[in-house]
């Protein structure tokens, strides 16, 4: 079994063609939705983003417990459930809050994870030059 769980932060479903949005073309998302299981009757139970993520991870309403925080030791995340069923899970995220104090635990439930830097308040600034040009500029005139 292969499972890809796609979560977009602060994206209204009406922005995607697969859900009837027509303001912009979203052919890649539309193709993905056509080949996937989609949720048509899901509503956020807790807001904003991190409490909503805890809802999704645990299947419980976060606002009933607290406003903001990490997954707790007693929380059963969907990544835990997948692992128990023999399904490997991998997280790819640009969400820096997963790695800050108070947001810890969300990424650790997955079998593996990858953090794409440079979003939100992450101080890292990516290089945008093509790799070969960037390395030539950095090292071609250096003699060691």
Question: What is each residue range found by the language model?
Answer:
Residues 53-144:
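Catalytic-site neighborhoods of secreted/periplasmic enzymes
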Residues 13, 38, 62-66:
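Short helix-loop boundary/capping segments at the starts of domains
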Residues 37-44, 88-94:
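Conserved S-adenosyl-L-methionine
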Residues 42-55:
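Short, surface-exposed acidic-centric catalytic microdomains
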Residues 11, 34, 38, 51-52, ...:
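Residue-level signal for pocket-adjacent positions within structured domains
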């Amino acid at each position: 079994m292969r499972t890809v769980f796609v979560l977009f932060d602060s994206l209204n479903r009406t922005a995607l063609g697969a859900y009837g949005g027509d303001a912009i073309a979203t052919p890649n998302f539309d193709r993905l939705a056509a080949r996937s299981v989609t949720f048509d009757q899901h509503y956020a139970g807790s807001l904003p983003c991190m409490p909503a993520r805890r809802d999704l991870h645990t299947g419980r309403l976060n606002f009933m417990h607290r406003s903001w925080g990490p997954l707790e030791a007693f929380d059963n995340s969907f990544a835990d459930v997948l692992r128990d069923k023999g399904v490997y899970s991998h997280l790819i995220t640009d969400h820096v809050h997963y790695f800050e104090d108070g947001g810890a635990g969300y990424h650790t439930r997955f079998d593996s994870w990858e953090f794409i830097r440079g979003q939100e308040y992450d101080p890292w600034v990516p290089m945008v030059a093509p790799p070969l040009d960037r390395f030539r500029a950095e090292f071609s005139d250096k003699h060691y």
